[in-house]
């Protein structure tokens, strides 16, 4: 069993909540029959303690203990700020 902490990168799609953001994670999946690669998106609720994220920011997140019913990811750092 490994104790490696799971980290992902994604784009912030909503920052309307207090201390929380919604991050969209894009991944490419191969179609089982036709072999074409399809883009799949997963939306995760992420804990943002200092409200430092904005819409469109690219962020790095890590898996953590459950903080609420839907939040079990926490913000590590803002990789790239969105251009307004």
Curated annotation (Swiss-Prot):
Q: Which UniProt keywords apply?
A: Ribonucleoprotein, Ribosomal protein, RNA-binding, rRNA-binding
The name this protein carries in UniProt is Small ribosomal subunit protein uS17
* Organism, scientific name: Proteus mirabilis (strain HI4320)
According to the UniProt entry, its GO molecular function terms are: rRNA binding; structural constituent of ribosome
- Tell me how this protein assembles: Part of the 30S ribosomal subunit.
Known role: One of the primary rRNA binding proteins, it binds specifically to the 5'-end of 16S ribosomal RNA.
Identify its protein family: Belongs to the universal ribosomal protein uS17 family.
InterPro entries assigned: NA-bd_OB-fold, Ribosomal_uS17, Ribosomal_uS17_bact/chlr, Ribosomal_uS17_CS
Q: Which GO terms describe its cellular component?
A: cytosolic small ribosomal subunit
**A GO term (biological process) for this protein?**
translation
**A Pfam family matched by this chain, by name?**
Ribosomal_S17
């Amino acid at each position: 069993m490994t104790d490696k902490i799971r980290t992902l990168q994604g784009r912030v799609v909503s920052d309307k909540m207090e201390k929380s953001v919604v991050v969209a994670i894009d991944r490419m999946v191969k179609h089982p029959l036709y072999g074409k690669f399809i883009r799949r998106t997963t939306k995760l609720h992420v804990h943002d303690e200092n409200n430092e994220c904005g819409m469109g920011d690219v962020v790095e997140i890590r898996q953590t203990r459950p903080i609420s019913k839907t939040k079990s990811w926490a913000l590590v750092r803002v990789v790239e700020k969105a251009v307004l």
